Curated annotation (Swiss-Prot):
Name of the protein this chain belongs to: UPF0246 protein Pfl01_0961
Entry-linked PANTHER family: PEROXIDE STRESS RESISTANCE PROTEIN YAAA, PEROXIDE STRESS RESPONSE PROTEIN YAAA
UniProt xrefs under InterPro entries: YaaA
Family: Belongs to the UPF0246 family.
Annotated Pfam families: H2O2_YaaD
GO cellular component, one term: cytosol
Biological process (GO), any one: response to hydroperoxide
Organism: Pseudomonas fluorescens (strain Pf0-1)
């Protein structure tokens, strides 16, 4: 089973990494093409393109300017440890053992607007470029057109390497839309995590993002390769709902979030 998750806007390049091992991103020639185009934009144009503040626009203009295809532990960090959003809080990769990193490297991928597809130990230089960014480019009107079927093809390779055709989608719609299903040789399993609010179970973004990370961690720590075993996920109060689930859409409910 191969999992895909979204990246995060928040990054952590201060905390020393939990492992010294690293790999090189596999698709940097594509990233470099985007970087060259982004370098032509002023900080103000970047702010407008990304709908962010002048401060964040300036920060990312500087990041694009200093980006280099020579990735080292001095100028980059393993992707799984560099991302710091809600999904990654649930994943808590900083506490992984080397065996956990081994399993994650084979069974987990991160979708990325700049890097396309990342393995956990791939070095990553800091950036912000969300997949939904409407950056017109030589390949089309946006990043979905830029990546085309490439991400699906790379996922097919990763699926073959790890031994089956099951893809567990733990990514957001924005990012999973970069996966062209017609080009994907996989059985896709989707998940929903719902919390009780005012007597109803609803998807609450903050909790759902963290739950995707918790599920990723659960699969990695338990080395789960049978989709049926995903129903055993019971971390932090979640439980499988047979009533609300379908064979390829697993729903988990929770009555109370931990204090």
């Amino acid at each position: 089973m191969l999992m895909v998750i979204s990246p995060a806007k928040t990054l952590d390049y201060e905390t020393p990494p939990a492992t010294q091992r690293f790999t090189q991103p596999q698709y940097l020639d594509h990233s470099q093409e985007l970087i060259q185009q982004l370098r032509e934009l002023s900080p103000a144009q970047i702010s407008e393109l990304m709908h962010v503040s002048d401060k964040i626009g300036g920060l990312n203009a500087a990041r694009f300017g200093s980006w280099t295809p020579a990735f080292t532990p001095e100028n980059a960090k393993q992707a799984l440890l560099a991302f710091k959003g809600d999904v990654y809080t649930g994943l808590d990769a900083q506490s992984f053992s080397e065996a956990n990193f081994d399993y994650a490297q084979k069974h987990l991928r991160m979708l990325s607007g700049l890097y396309g597809l990342l393995r956990p130990l791939d070095l990553m230089q800091p950036y912000r470029l969300e997949m939904g960014t409407k950056l017109a480019n030589a390949r089309g009107k946006d990043l979905y057109a830029f990546w085309g079927t490439r991400i699906s093809e790379w996922l097919n390779e990763a699926l073959a390497d790890q031994g089956d055709d099951v893809l567990l989608n733990l990514a957001s719609n924005e990012y999973f839309s970069a996966v062209k299903r017609t080009a994907l040789n996989a059985r896709i399993i989707n998940t929903e995590f719902k919390d009780q609010k005012n007597g109803q179970y609803k998807i609450i973004s903050f909790y759902a993002k963290k739950a995707r990370g918790l599920m990723s961690r659960f699969v990695i720590q338990e080395k789960i390769n049978d989709p049926a075993l995903l129903k055993q996920f019971d971390v932090q109060g979640y439980r499988y709902s047979a009533e609300q689930s379908k064979p390829d859409n697993l729903v988990f409910l929770r009555d109370h979030a931990p204090e």
